[in-house]
Amino acid sequence: MKKNLNDFKRLLLTACCTLVLSCGWATVNEKPFVIPELKQWSGAEGMFTPSGKYVVKGGKNAQEVAKLFAADYHDLVGKPLTPKTGKPSAGDIVLVLQSDKKSARLLGKEGYRLTIGDVTTITASSVEGLVWGTRTVLQLSEQQRSAGFVLPKGSTQDKPAYGLRGFMMDCGRKFIPMSYLRSLVKMMSYYKMNTLQIHLNDNGFRQFFGNDWAKTQAAFRLECDTYPGLTAKDGSYSKAEFIELQKLAEQYGVNIIPEIDVPAHSLAFTHYKPEIGSREYGMDHLDLFNPETYKFVDGLFKEYLEGKNPVFRGKIVHIGTDEYSNAKKEVVEKFRYFTDHYIKYVESFGKQAAVWGALTHAKGDTKVKSENVMMHCWYNGYADPKEMKRQGYKLVSIPDGLVYIVPAAGYYYDYLNCQYLYDSWTPAQIGNEKFEENDSAILGGMFAVWNDHAGNGITVKDIHDRLFPALQTLSAKCWTGAATSFSFEKFNRLRLALSEAPAVNEAARWQKGKQLRIETLNPGQTTGEKEVGYGYRVEFTIEGADEPKGTVLFSSDNATFYLADPESGQLGFAHEGYLNKFNYRVEKGKKVTLAITGDNRKTSLYVDGKLREELGPLTLYAMQQKDLATFQKSDATAWQPVVYNPSAKMHYQRTLVFPLQKAGDFKSHITGVKVSQK
């Protein structure tokens, strides 16, 4: 009996030890990687396996979010997500929209609660919060492609550190197609960036256009009935499609801020109506002392703001006020009057006004309304942020020295320093001024793309290449603030595994190891691939024929690659109004193997395995009389050279995202087509 009792004690002790050890070694899921980073995470054991069903609790608005989520889920993972009613079962995803005060207090306007157990539940007190919760689930899902799109069990209560998280696109100097803006809305939503500012008018720099304002590039991009002929001829948006863009953005939780920039950066308006241009400060400045200026600008804003269903649907409208001259006291006071007038004019239509910070640069006595006015603080010499806070403005942190992208300009950033921003910046840092985190005066942060050098060869694909890593980085810093816990090395490595957005691939990235092979390419043939992005190699063997000028090898919606370009009959490519050519012609009866490679800096041609030519950046100089260098003559008969020492230069880009959608109508015999991407 005693022996049996001892055996029982040993068995009991063993069982207890086993239980303790198993509990101690149980695998609790670490915080999963998403962008922006979850503010907090409570891990659990195991994985959630999706059933492909979802349940909605919360009325019509919740149903609309669920439909959007289901469509994006299908696009992203390739599997349907269908609705069901009744009690959720294991593997179901539940979307809950609660409007009670407790949820609103805990989650705020954009927060959500995500619980992943046998059932996954997204709970929010607002439509925006519910949308953001679905973005988290989508990002978690796509990282588990090889495991069947399972989700790590655990829970989070996630809400942003800053209420405004955004980006500004200069569409005035460089036309950005509506198709890209629609993709951009989806990308921003996927990374919980909630503000897209569209800069609708601007102009190039006069020195690149013969120092002639009349010849200098300028554009206003929106359809305009009030002033027929004002709208740009080289690319514009109809009012109907601009409204549809805003509706799409509303679905995705993104606010569109349209910007009409006055009274500087206004050459498009003075091209149309020269009498309102300033003869003293330049025709890119409106004449603030001319009553016709105010009639014109009033009429312009009114067209987009009046009526029950205005073209500008959102709550905020940006009136510009950027970089006007402060040369004289009287012009400073008139600028302040102009700014105050248009803040109040926009408000008269029920909108909130936004301005570029300029009131330190234009310091004066004329009062400018500050209550409920949004100010973009971009350069502290133009608007001292602490003084603007004291005056009562609501600030947007967009410091030029940190978050301005000016593609290929040679100043500001070509690509943002994402490591510095990730490690060291939050919206509380405006230039050299540091505010407390979550200071109530700071609405949030943005970055910007300014296309200063109109005509420099930069394409939308080049802009996208610069924009996307910045978007991911600013997303993290504007949502999570100073509380990021992942190292930049980990962030920078894992961000590459995430999509741009469901069904969006503007960079034309291919899956690792993917290739396109075509044994014989026939005229007019479609390939099943639209294009291939940077890091590509396109190789083929060609037995040349007599190809007329304009003969196409491949084309897509974005670009055309020529066997014989339309101007000179050389190998070349065209996109967005630019034509670039290699110094090479396809020769009749000659058989060669050609390869074209391309990255974000250059496009290269190889002939029979040897590099023939690289089309990299070209430095172009603006020659002006003031740059003429003078030399002392040794005597009256000595020859004097004409030498320029130009300070203004442009770096013309010759990159290409290679088109593959459709073969052209060529005569040459083309075989062995092979396309790959690093």
Region roles according to the model:
Residues 2-13:
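Bacterial N-terminal signal peptides that target proteins for export
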